[in-house]
């Protein structure tokens, strides 16, 4: 199964992608996450550092594919998730689609592309050209990360249009939306009523999700460390200790959202070919909703 994760810039795609990758790994799947962003920080919370990009590695070898080994470009991450960063062209030059194509080509040359149960492409920002829609050429499903806001849903609608276009040439489907860090979902529900598509999950507005990115750790790793610390402290202070008790939701609670998403994806859902709204129609729908509040 190949997944492509899209959404408005800064919406939390990489945080979402990393936690979904671990959730899929916890369900027994062999997972590769491919970051498709010139910032090459998609897999940072999995590996703990900025790994070298495919393009940098190819450049250092003068694009001699035969001189590159899997360990040169594939790095092990937390929970057993393998990680690759495609990188990107120099600022103001080149095409992101070319970079994604070169990444897939190299992984095929290394006999690695088909060795995974799940490959997840984490793609930068909004779809603004055919190049950045390139991961959709390889994906079985697209996942759109959004929130309950005006701009994020505009981006989601544009991505939906790209899915429909790419679905003309191969069996791509939209698996659904993921609402990330939002206290409400009324605008999301209004949008999917007008443009029918599944909502895989809506994650609540929990600070731990943002903090995990700042710490450079996935929520699963934070949960594991906190559980170990609590167990150690409870053991040393006795059963009546309140150490580790928090008024905020635990990381375990948040991780269950990602496990639920993974479980839905592993059923290989039918998905949809979306019919995006026209810009004017969407603007009217969302702006009217705001004005009525």
Curated annotation (Swiss-Prot):
<dbReference type="GO" id="GO:0051539">
    <property type="term" value="F:4 iron, 4 sulfur cluster binding"/>
</dbReference>
<keyword id="KW-0560">Oxidoreductase</keyword>
<dbReference type="GO" id="GO:0005524">
    <property type="term" value="F:ATP binding"/>
</dbReference>
<keyword id="KW-0067">ATP-binding</keyword>
<dbReference type="InterPro" id="IPR027417">
    <property type="entry name" value="P-loop_NTPase"/>
</dbReference>
<keyword id="KW-0408">Iron</keyword>
<keyword id="KW-0460">Magnesium</keyword>
<feature type="binding site">
    <location>
        <begin position="10"/>
        <end position="15"/>
    </location>
    <ligand>
        <name>ATP</name>
    </ligand>
</feature>
<dbReference type="Pfam" id="PF00142">
    <property type="entry name" value="Fer4_NifH"/>
</dbReference>
<dbReference type="GO" id="GO:0016730">
    <property type="term" value="F:oxidoreductase activity, acting on iron-sulfur proteins as donors"/>
</dbReference>
<dbReference type="InterPro" id="IPR000392">
    <property type="entry name" value="NifH/frxC"/>
</dbReference>
<keyword id="KW-0149">Chlorophyll biosynthesis</keyword>
<dbReference type="GO" id="GO:0019685">
    <property type="term" value="P:photosynthesis, dark reaction"/>
</dbReference>
<dbReference type="InterPro" id="IPR030655">
    <property type="entry name" value="NifH/chlL_CS"/>
</dbReference>
<keyword id="KW-0602">Photosynthesis</keyword>
<comment type="function">
    <text>Component of the dark-operative protochlorophyllide reductase (DPOR) that uses Mg-ATP and reduced ferredoxin to reduce ring D of protochlorophyllide (Pchlide) to form chlorophyllide a (Chlide). This reaction is light-independent. The L component serves as a unique electron donor to the NB-component of the complex, and binds Mg-ATP.</text>
</comment>
<comment type="similarity">
    <text>Belongs to the NifH/BchL/ChlL family.</text>
</comment>
<dbReference type="GO" id="GO:0009507">
    <property type="term" value="C:chloroplast"/>
</dbReference>
<feature type="binding site">
    <location>
        <position position="39"/>
    </location>
    <ligand>
        <name>ATP</name>
    </ligand>
</feature>
<feature type="binding site">
    <location>
        <position position="129"/>
    </location>
    <ligand>
        <name>[4Fe-4S] cluster</name>
    </ligand>
</feature>
<dbReference type="GO" id="GO:0046872">
    <property type="term" value="F:metal ion binding"/>
</dbReference>
<keyword id="KW-0547">Nucleotide-binding</keyword>
<keyword id="KW-0479">Metal-binding</keyword>
<comment type="subunit">
    <text>Homodimer. Protochlorophyllide reductase is composed of three subunits; ChlL, ChlN and ChlB.</text>
</comment>
<feature type="binding site">
    <location>
        <begin position="180"/>
        <end position="181"/>
    </location>
    <ligand>
        <name>ATP</name>
    </ligand>
</feature>
<keyword id="KW-0004">4Fe-4S</keyword>
<dbReference type="GO" id="GO:0036068">
    <property type="term" value="P:light-independent chlorophyll biosynthetic process"/>
</dbReference>
<feature type="binding site">
    <location>
        <position position="14"/>
    </location>
    <ligand>
        <name>Mg(2+)</name>
    </ligand>
</feature>
<keyword id="KW-0411">Iron-sulfur</keyword>
<comment type="pathway">
    <text>Porphyrin-containing compound metabolism; chlorophyll biosynthesis (light-independent).</text>
</comment>
<keyword id="KW-0934">Plastid</keyword>
<keyword id="KW-0150">Chloroplast</keyword>
<dbReference type="GO" id="GO:0016636">
    <property type="term" value="F:oxidoreductase activity, acting on the CH-CH group of donors, iron-sulfur protein as acceptor"/>
</dbReference>
<feature type="binding site">
    <location>
        <position position="95"/>
    </location>
    <ligand>
        <name>[4Fe-4S] cluster</name>
    </ligand>
</feature>
<dbReference type="InterPro" id="IPR005971">
    <property type="entry name" value="Protochlorophyllide_ATP-bd"/>
</dbReference>
<protein>
    <recommendedName>
        <fullName>Light-independent protochlorophyllide reductase iron-sulfur ATP-binding protein</fullName>
        <ecNumber>1.3.7.7</ecNumber>
    </recommendedName>
</protein>
């Amino acid at each position: 199964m190949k997944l492509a994760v899209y959404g408005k810039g800064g919406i939390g795609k990489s945080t979402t992608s990393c936690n979904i990758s671990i959730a899929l790994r916890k369900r027994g799947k062999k997972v590769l996450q491919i970051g498709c962003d010139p910032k090459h920080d998609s897999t940072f919370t999995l590996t703990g550092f900025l790994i070298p990009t495919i393009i940098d590695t190819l450049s250092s070898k003068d694009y001699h594919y035969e001189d590159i080994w899997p360990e040169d470009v594939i790095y092990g991450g937390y929970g057993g998730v393998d990680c690759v960063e495609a990188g990107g062209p120099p600022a103001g030059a080149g095409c992101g689609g070319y970079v994604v194509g070169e990444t897939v080509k190299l992984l095929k040359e290394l006999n690695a592309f088909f060795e995974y149960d799940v490959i997840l492409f984490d793609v930068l920002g909004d779809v603004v050209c055919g190049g950045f829609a390139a991961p959709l050429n390889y994906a079985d499903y697209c996942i759109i990360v959004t929130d309950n806001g005006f701009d994020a849903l505009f981006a989601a609608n544009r991505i939906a249009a790209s899915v429909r276009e790419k679905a003309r040439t191969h069996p791509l489907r939209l698996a659904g939306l993921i609402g990330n860090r939002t206290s409400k979902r009324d605008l999301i529900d209004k949008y999917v009523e007008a443009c029918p598509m599944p909502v895989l999950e809506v994650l609540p507005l929990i600070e731990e999700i943002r903090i995990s990115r700042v710490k450079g750790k996935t929520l699963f790793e934070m949960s594991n460390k906190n559980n170990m610390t609590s167990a150690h402290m409870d053991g040393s202070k006795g059963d009546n200790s309140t150490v580790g008790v928090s008024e905020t939701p635990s990381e375990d609670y948040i991780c269950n959202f990602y496990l639920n998403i993974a479980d839905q994806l592993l059923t290989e859902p039918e998905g949809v070919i979306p019919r995006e709204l026209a810009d004017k129609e969407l603007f009217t729908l969302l702006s009217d909703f705001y004005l009525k509040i």
